[in-house]
Amino acid sequence: MGAANSKDSPYYNWYSFTNYPDKYECWWGFENLPNVNENHHDYTEYITGKDGVISYWHNMGASGWRLDVADELPDEFIEALYKRAKETNKDSFIIGEVWEDATNKFAYGVRRKYLLGGQMDSVMNYPFRTAILDFVKSKNSRLFEDRIFEILENYPPQVTACLMNSISTHDTERALTFFGVQNNVQPEDYGKYILSQEEYQRGKNGLLLATFLQYTLPGLPSVYYGDEAGQNGFKDPYCRKTYPYGKEDFEILDFYKSLGKIRNEFKEDFCLGFTPIENRDGFFSFKRGKLICVINLSEEPRDVNVPGTVIFEHGNISKDNTNLISNPNSAMIITSK
């Protein structure tokens, strides 16, 4: 028997009714999303108890959990969930949706302790998303480096290693649309707006350069379905269109596959630090293990004087005697000798 059917329901005390049974506290005013009291003993036990939801799905093969809107979950509940997940499977992975720097986050007047141990293994990396998209659009490599190091300096290395790096999500405008559409489209037109060929190509160019950074920066690239096939879309809910079956952009798809192959082949290198080499007017190069990653968003060709073998290239890469030349809007990965 449900809580709205009877006050004798075992679930009644999980909710806060203001005018039973029709009015109750709900998430951001959405009546189909009633708030639950996560710290009510019966509810906490239902989710995190020995025979609760967490244990059930782990025993069915689930390997981890993403905590949606972590700011609105009490510390005590997150800690109980984390503890049960690790007791059920020590390798269970808990990741939280946190949009800001998770080490100094205040939510509802409370300083959160997501990364102090016992709550989360890592978080969604929205700060990197902002840094990447802004860099590709503005070409400001100095600001980009500052933003990256702000996170790297604050986060524990074990958290950084498994950050969820996305450039599009179910809550944001898709990267291709972000780069492609430059005019001010009104929200009421989001659903019917069709990108022109020029807008699509501009968006595609930006998407590929942003994806290069997504795959080469510290953390784990997390692809929002459809980005790898050329899907576009404005903010939620228009970013949630289905995968474009039969209409994939195979040039984009091959680009993602190539970067994914390199991530798999050089796993150890992508776990080894992040060392900037050169940062100048939209040109940025950095080292990951024995790999040198180079992106040139400037208006000028730049010499890349690094001995080694190019294992990935995008855009116009050329040679001048012994030097590689990174032309505008290009990127490459080199295995150094």
Locations of regions flagged by a protein language model:
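Short, solvent-exposed loop/turn segments at secondary-structure junctions
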Residues: 58, 63, 71-74, 99-102, ...
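Substrate-binding/active-site clefts of carbohydrate-active enzymes
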Residues: 1-60, 81, 87
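Active-site-proximal helices and loops of the catalytic beta/alpha 8
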Residues: 53-55, 63-64, 68-163, 213, ...
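Aromatic-anchored helix/helix-loop segment that forms the rim or "lid"
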Residues: 145, 149-151, 183-208, 265
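The substrate-binding groove and active-site-proximal loops of carbohydrate-active enzymes
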Residues: 30-45, 62-72, 131-139, 191-202, ...
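Aromatic/acidic polysaccharide-binding cleft in carbohydrate-active enzymes
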Residues: 109, 121-122, 164-195, 211-250
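Carbohydrate-interacting/catalytic domains
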Residues: 203-204, 216-223, 227-337
